[in-house]
Amino acid sequence: MKKNTIYFILFTLSLNFSFSQNLKDKNILVVWGGWEGHKPELFVKHIENWLIFEEANYKIHNGLEAYNSYEELIKYDLIIQSITMSKISKEQENNLLKAIKNGVGIGGAHGGLTDSFRESTNYQFMVGGQWVDHPGGEVNFKVKMLKDELTKGLNDFEIKTEQYYMHYDPNIKVIANTKFNDEYYPWIDGVVMPVAWKKEYGNGKVFYVSIGHDPDEFINEENAWKLLTRGLKWATR
């Protein structure tokens, strides 16, 4: 474990000089829970190591009780969420959306952000999309970077993970995408789908990347980690 932590710190040091936003002294809330198949605790561990390196003020909370108070949420500059499925109460939903609308950023990956609360269309409207399928399960596919400040200097890459098929808001700014083939569903052959996007919701900013079925994907693929961490910095108030 100690060896892995040292490796992670060295890895992070090598990646974070190219994007100017600084998280030092920013207040970050990390919320995790839901379906354990997406290993939210491991995702949060990687995020925590990064936040320590960035010298951010952070709090980690397991469960949706983190959204019980708007007065507490509005104190944060960024919420990083990793909750697949689960159910959010109306009060929690209102608190979260109000905080983001008033300037708190939010970001996350994979099902931890776009498959969180399937019954909450208000939440989906804020995030900008909803997962609906991953044809073939874990498959090999290519992620293509599009021109944007967050992708500057990043390379396209091949990865084996779930290739998310999304229902998404045309108002999002897509910064990375992928193309489906006809292996599992012939009618989606050639469909181009977002892999990462950014958007605004009121005064708040939203960042999402769809890879990360196994959180270690972000450690094993340099460009994926850069994309995630740059996006989270961008979303920070």
Where are these regions (language model features)?
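Bacterial Sec-dependent N-terminal signal peptides
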Residues: 1-23
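Short, flexible, glycine/charge-rich loop motifs used to bind or transfer phosphoryl groups or to couple energy/partner
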Residues: 18-21, 68-71, 163-165, 197
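Helical hinge/lid and interdomain linker segments adjacent to catalytic or ligand-binding clefts
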Residues: 22, 26-31, 36-114, 218
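Extracellular ligand-binding/catalytic regions of CAZymes and related secreted enzymes
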Residues: 22-30, 53, 71, 184-193, ...
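Catalytic beta-strand/loop cores that center a nucleophilic Ser/Cys/Thr
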Residues: 51-54, 75, 134-208
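Oxidoreductase and adenylate-handling cofactor-binding alpha/beta cores
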Residues: 122-130, 158-159, 165-173, 202, ...
